[in-house]
């Protein structure tokens, strides 16, 4: 009994010292401004989670371009000067680490235990199968899946041109998810069954997506924790390696990565969790992004006209083959500078990722101004490009306005020259992240979104139920989690054009 009391006392002493050191943390010389908030340990957590954008905007106004805040017992140093991003992103000294944070996150969210080399493996697989010839093959598979999802297994009657009504966000998310899921995970012999399965999986995916932000922050209620666990198990089962064996057409990209895991001796149950992670990574942002793209086009008829003219010039006349397949040449995606600018501008306005690095050893942050700051080991360095880059009026004049030609030069080529304080800036748009955390699947994601938008432009008539409805604000719960989502749905009408 005496021994246990001694051990317990020692543990309490250690924990007490740790807590005391956190509570008594103060700013040292050469460190950034420190703002711990008024609530011990929690710090600014509640304000940050309530509206990350407004919180960081207020902190920048108070402290400047570099500041450290306490969030749930952890200290985050936010850097708001994009001219100073380079050393953080390149990180040649390896003092800043991305993978340790990423491994913790995927274990918590998807149940996947990362192994040595799998981050490099994902990038190798993406380079081989999501670029060049591999990308062209996957683009064709995505086109076939979009034809199946949008026209049905029996094809669409050319006379069926009556208007249908739906929520634009739901429509885009559902179509892109189902087509993406089928393109990556393959088909059975029963196409209608495949569509029904994808539809059911989409409903579960949306529920998980709804809970996701609070899940990451550990803010779920008891029943929601149970529900999340049930959803995780469902996806592990429905995306299992065993079930995939019954399907044809699994993507070479996914097959390559699963082969690597098998060669590493990874259990099939862990491969199932890897599949869930890949489904989320590939389908969590494309549908929401396309919602914003179509909404901006509907609200800006000059942009719609420019994209239509480009689509007609590049693609020719729209036709349906055997009434159930879109006639579309995926290679044409390389020749759409206007649509490329529309996509980049939409992503500038709707993509809100947070880039995090864990400080592995005491680190000197060197700013473009020449100022240097000491960052402590164990802290996190964070970038929030939506506020510091995308909404900077010096880089992007009228930053809150949608300008479809913002990323076009007068001669119609892509614009890449942007400036801040008179200096050319490299990081002028960061919807995909940057450095080691840059999305490896961005080329395929962009291709599938462009394909969907072009199909809607060429083959469908669509309009808003209320043409005067304003663009909805971003749901504040989604700040920092990839592509933002609207605070409310927008109703629209659509119908298949009478094509031959």
Curated annotation (Swiss-Prot):
It is found in: Endoplasmic reticulum membrane; Microsome membrane. Changing residue 242 to K: In strain: 129/SvJ. GO terms for biological process: bile acid biosynthetic process; positive regulation of intestinal cholesterol absorption; steroid biosynthetic process. It holds the Pfam family p450. It catalyses: 7alpha-hydroxycholest-4-en-3-one + reduced [NADPH--hemoprotein reductase] + O2 = 7alpha,12alpha-dihydroxycholest-4-en-3-one + oxidized [NADPH--hemoprotein reductase] + H2O + H(+); 5beta-cholestane-3alpha,7alpha-diol + reduced [NADPH--hemoprotein reductase] + O2 = 5beta-cholestane-3alpha,7alpha,12alpha-triol + oxidized [NADPH--hemoprotein reductase] + H2O + H(+); chenodeoxycholate + reduced [NADPH--hemoprotein reductase] + O2 = cholate + oxidized [NADPH--hemoprotein reductase] + H2O + H(+). Its EC number is 1.14.14.139. The chain crosses the membrane at residues 4-24. Expressed in liver. Heme binds at residue 439. Pathway: Lipid metabolism; bile acid biosynthesis. This is 7-alpha-hydroxycholest-4-en-3-one 12-alpha-hydroxylase. The lineage of its organism: Eukaryota, Metazoa, Chordata, Craniata, Vertebrata.
């Amino acid at each position: 009994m005496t021994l246990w009391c001694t051990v317990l006392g020692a543990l309490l002493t250690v924990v007490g010292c740790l807590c005391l050191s956190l509570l008594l943390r103060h700013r040292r010389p050469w460190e950034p401004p420190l703002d711990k908030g008024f609530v011990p340990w929690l710090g600014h957590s509640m304000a940050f989670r309530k509206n990350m954008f407004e919180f960081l905007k207020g902190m920048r106004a108070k402290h400047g371009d570099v500041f450290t805040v306490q969030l749930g017992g952890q200290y985050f140093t936010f850097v708001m000067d994009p001219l100073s991003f380079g050393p953080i992103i390149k990180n040649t000294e390896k003092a800043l680490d991305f993978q340790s944070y990423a491994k913790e996150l995927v274990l918590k969210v998807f149940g996947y235990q990362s192994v040595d080399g799998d981050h490099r493996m994902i990038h190798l697989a993406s380079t081989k199968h999501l670029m060049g010839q591999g990308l062209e093959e996957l683009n064709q598979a995505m086109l076939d899946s979009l034809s199946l999802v949008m026209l049905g297994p029996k094809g669409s009657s050319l006379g069926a041109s009556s208007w249908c009504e739906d929520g634009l966000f739901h429509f885009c998310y559902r179509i892109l998810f189902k087509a993406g899921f089928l393109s990556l995970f393959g088909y059975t012999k029963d196409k209608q069954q495949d569509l029904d399965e994808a539809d059911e999986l989409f409903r579960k995916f949306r529920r998980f997506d709804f809970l996701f932000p609070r899940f990451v922050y550990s803010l779920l209620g008891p029943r929601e924790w149970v529900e999340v666990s049930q959803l995780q198990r469902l996806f592990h089962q429905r995306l299992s390696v065993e079930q995939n064996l019954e399907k044809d057409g699994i993507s070479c990209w996914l097959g390559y990565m699963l082969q690597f895991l098998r060669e590493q001796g990874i259990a099939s149950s862990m491969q199932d969790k890897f599949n869930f992670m890949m489904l989320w990574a590939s389908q969590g942002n494309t549908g929401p992004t396309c919602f914003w793209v179509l909404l901006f086009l509907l609200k800006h008829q000059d942009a719609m006209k420019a994209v239509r003219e480009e689509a007609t010039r590049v693609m020719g006349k729209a036709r349906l083959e055997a009434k159930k397949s879109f006639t579309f040449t995926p290679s044409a995606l390389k020749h759409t500078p206007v649509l490329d600018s529309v996509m980049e501008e939409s992503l500038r306005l709707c993509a809100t990722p947070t880039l995090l690095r864990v400080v592995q050893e005491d680190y000197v942050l060197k700013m473009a101004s020449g100022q240097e700051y000491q960052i402590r080991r164990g802290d996190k360095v964070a970038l929030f490009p939506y506020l510091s880059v995308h909404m900077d009026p010096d880089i992007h004049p009228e930053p809150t306005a949608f300008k479809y030609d913002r990323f076009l030069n007068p001669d119609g080529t892509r614009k890449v020259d942007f400036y801040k304080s008179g200096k050319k800036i490299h990081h002028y748009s960061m919807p995909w992240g940057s450095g080691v955390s840059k999305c490896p699947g961005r080329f395929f994601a962009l291709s599938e979104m462009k394909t969907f938008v072009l199909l809607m432009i060429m083959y469908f008539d669509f309009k808003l139920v209320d043409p005067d409805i304003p663009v909805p604000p971003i749901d504040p719960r989604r700040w920092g989690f990839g592509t933002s989502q609207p605070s409310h749905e927008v109703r629209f009408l659509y119908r298949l054009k009478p094509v031959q």
